[in-house]
């Protein structure tokens, strides 16, 4: 009987060790009291870029409320424009976009906290090959 318990204990121990090895690293999301509304504009000319960026930003915890095409379609790099000074999501959004191109354009009539102008280096940001 004690041999049986020993085998059962060993089995549980091995199962516990193997399940620990298979655990994936969870991404740590920065929680904000207000996610902020974000506008995404396709400024690179790549078909479906705004939809892909919307999906990526939503997976990162941002509330994308508007997507559309920009009049200009020749941006090489992604640009982040902040409309609300002091918005707590600014740093997290810039980090998610992997950009240092951040402009502050205060607009009291803006209905979003930030606008994202997608550049041609979109794939480097969202790490997808399906574009």
Annotate the PLM regions.
Residues 1-8:
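Bacterial N-terminal signal peptides that target proteins for export
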Residues 16-19:
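C-terminal motif of bacterial Sec signal peptides marking the signal peptidase cleavage site
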Residues 25-36, 77, 84-87:
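Accessory recognition modules or surfaces
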Residues 30-74:
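Extracytoplasmic/periplasm-facing segments of secreted or lipoprotein envelope proteins
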Residues 64-118, 123:
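BRCT (BRCA1 C-terminal) domain core and associated BRCT-interaction motifs
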Residues 129-131:
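Short, solvent-exposed mixed-charge patches
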């Amino acid at each position: 009987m004690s041999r049986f318990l020993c085998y059962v204990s060993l089995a549980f121990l091995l199962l516990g060790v193997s399940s620990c090895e298979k655990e994936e690293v969870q991404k740590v999301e920065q929680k904000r009291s207000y996610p902020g509304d974000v506008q995404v504009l396709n400024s690179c000319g790549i078909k479906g870029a705004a939809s892909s960026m919307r999906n990526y930003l939503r997976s990162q915890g941002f509330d994308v409320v508007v997507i559309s095409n920009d009049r200009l379609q020749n941006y090489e790099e992604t640009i982040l424009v902040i409309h609300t000074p002091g918005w707590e999501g600014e740093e997290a959004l810039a980090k998610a976009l992997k950009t240092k191109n951040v402009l502050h354009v205060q607009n009291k009539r803006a209905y979003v906290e930030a606008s994202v102008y997608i550049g041609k280096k979109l794939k480097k940001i969202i790490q997808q090959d399906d574009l």
